[in-house]
Amino acid sequence: MDAGRRARHESGMSELAPLVADGNRRALARAITLIESGRADHRAEAASLLAALPKGREALRIGLSGTPGVGKSTFIEAFGLMLVEAGKRVAVLAVDPSSARTGGSILGDKTRMEQLSRHPMAFIRPSPSQSHLGGVARRTREAVSLCEGAGFDVVLIETVGVGQSETAVAEMCDVFVLLLAPAGGDELQGVKRGIMEIADLIVVNKADGDLKATATRTCADYAGALRLLRKRPQDPDTFPKAMMVSAVEGSGLVTAWEEMQELAAWRQGSGIWDARRAAQAAYWFREELRQGMEARLAAREDLAALEDDVRAGRKTAAGAAQEVLSALF
């Protein structure tokens, strides 16, 4: 970075950092745009900005997963409005690698969450435009840190509920919630075991009108499945809970929030909170290294030739790999 660019960089960060720290939503949006950029100078600015923000601010990070049709946008708006009305500052972020191809879930949801998006104590950010999960997850994780630095009390991290996005979200949240719609036994069989194993709370939405009886049965089915599947590893005497809400009617939202707070408080008091966040930081450190190494490997001009040598049998896979690793290190 030349002297002129460095001066502009430092000046820009000195102006942006205090605005973000004061909770300015426009400044926060600009900061997240820097994080999402693929330009090296923008990435450097973003790193400097993250380092300049106040330390020690911690939001409750809540991961929300649910496939299309469960009423996720309705739930997020109703839940978010309940929180801001209780005096909480709420940010909504997304991990959706499909957004570059399909428009993503939250891109449309932002227009439907009109009340929450207009509220001065709320901030909603669509998924970044990278089409691969690694890039989206990394940018979202950094956006979470920005939101904490901006003083938000709760960060809702939404995932579309397909692929490996749930695992990525679980590695950046304090409480992971699986949102479901009322369904029969066949649909229960279709829920992936993996997501059931990481969920801290299952919330059955749309528990109203003609669907209320079905929601009651669905909730009971999942509660039973959770008891058979696992116990909470941090507390062997308890199981993840399943509960019903109606985002349309507003029923059950307070109870769900109280359960999330209770779990977070228990983890904070037991030391699990700090250990979990430390493990997550280490996980993302390794991910940053892995993605950085992959990028450097992809930029090597001799990589294709080495791969051709391996295909043709002129070199062994181990030998060719060692050549690359020796050059890198």
Question: How would you name each of these model-derived features?
Answer:
Residues D2-R6:
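Extreme N-terminal basic, low-complexity initiation segments
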Residues L28-R30, M244-A247, V254-F329:
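Long, well-ordered amphipathic alpha-helical subdomains in the mid-to-C-terminal portions
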Residues P126-S127, L178-A181, V203-K206, M244:
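Conserved beta-strand segments of the P-loop GTPase G domain that flank and frequently precede/overlap
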